[in-house]
């Protein structure tokens, strides 16, 4: 068994692990400006590996909402618990999973709204900034997300059942060995999609996909937030050292953003 949850105030270098038939790499870093200010990151990455099953969630808090990190952490924690609760049989039915996930997300609004409503603002805030934040509070905290589950169904062939769901501008790239075969359709046009603590899903429905419906075999996936756009153009699987260097280089960019990265192979 292996679990990971982001510490939104600490960087996690690219780390490699082999566990439960899976080989995976992961890393987390706040934007350069956020690190300098010793502030909280907006991304939240969480995953769990056990009994030949890998469940993961990556949430990217919307910075223009009320403390996007709140929605990111809350939603990631809840989605991971949901993915872990689903049976192997249920997860094979993409349509059933999509309907269940949609209902689950709607059911989180009341609890999430209470968390936002009772969140205490820092005392040192200026009256103007406090007014701005109170206005944002009324509209809720928001986050984009991608989540999924991989279940190994045959040890010999390493065949797996995969379910993916996404809302927002998140990256999911699928590989068959060292060859990239597909990119899960969550692109720039989806940047207005997100989940809100006040309104639930916004600007469109969840996009889902499954291994049975992809029409293309794959045994590896990259999942990462838009802060790691530097690897979008890479057409081969980068070594860990290069990933770490690209992550470090991004901190000095004027457009530096939080980075979450997960590479799962089976």
Predicted features by range, described:
Residues 1-2, 7, 126-132, 194-266:
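C-terminal catalytic subdomain
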Residues 1-84, 170, 203-206, 210-211, ...:
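N-terminal entry segment of metal-dependent catalytic domains or homologous docking segments
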Residues 1-44, 111-139, 157, 182-188:
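Short glycine- and acidic-rich boundary segments immediately preceding or forming the N-terminal edge
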Residues 39-49, 137-163, 185-233:
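Acidic loop->beta-strand submotif enriched in PP2C/PPM serine/threonine phosphatases
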Residues 56-60, 165, 222-224:
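Short hydrophobic beta-strand that contains or immediately precedes a catalytic carboxylate
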Residues 66-68, 174-175, 232-233:
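Short helix/loop capping segments that flank catalytic or ligand/cofactor-binding pockets
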Residues 78-120, 233-257:
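Helix-loop-helix
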Residues 93-176, 204-215:
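Catalytic core of PPM/PP2C metal-dependent serine/threonine phosphatase domains
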């Amino acid at each position: 068994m292996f679990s990971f949850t982001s510490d939104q105030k600490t960087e996690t270098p690219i780390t490699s692990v082999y566990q439960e038939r899976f080989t995976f790499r992961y890393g987390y870093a706040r934007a350069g400006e956020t690190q300098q200010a010793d502030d909280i990151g907006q991304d939240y990455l969480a995953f769990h590996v056990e009994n030949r099953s890998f469940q993961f969630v990556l949430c990217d808090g919307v910075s223009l909402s009320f403390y996007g990190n709140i929605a990111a952490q809350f939603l990631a924690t809840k989605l991971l618990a949901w993915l872990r609760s689903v049976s192997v049989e249920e997860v094979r039915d993409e349509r059933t999973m999509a309907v269940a996930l949609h209902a689950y997300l709607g059911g989180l609004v009341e609890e999430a709204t209470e968390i936002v409503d009772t969140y205490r603002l820092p005392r040192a805030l200026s009256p103007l900034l406090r007014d701005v934040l109170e206005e944002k509070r009324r509209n809720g905290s928001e986050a984009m997300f991608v989540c999924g589950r991989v279940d190994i169904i045959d040890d010999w062939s390493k065949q797996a059942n995969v379910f993916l769901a996404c809302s927002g501008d998140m990256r999911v790239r699928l590989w068959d060995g060292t060859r990239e075969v597909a990119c899960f359709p969550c692109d720039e046009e989806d940047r207005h999609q997100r989940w809100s603590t006040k309104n639930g899903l916004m600007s469109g429905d969840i996009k889902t996909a499954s291994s049975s419906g992809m029409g293309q075999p794959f045994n590896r996936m990259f999942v990462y937030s838009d802060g790691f756009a530097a690897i979008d153009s890479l057409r081969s699987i980068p070594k860990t050292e290069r990933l770490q260097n690209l992550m470090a280089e991004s901190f000095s960019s004027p457009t530096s953003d939080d980075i979450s990265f997960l590479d799962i192979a089976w």
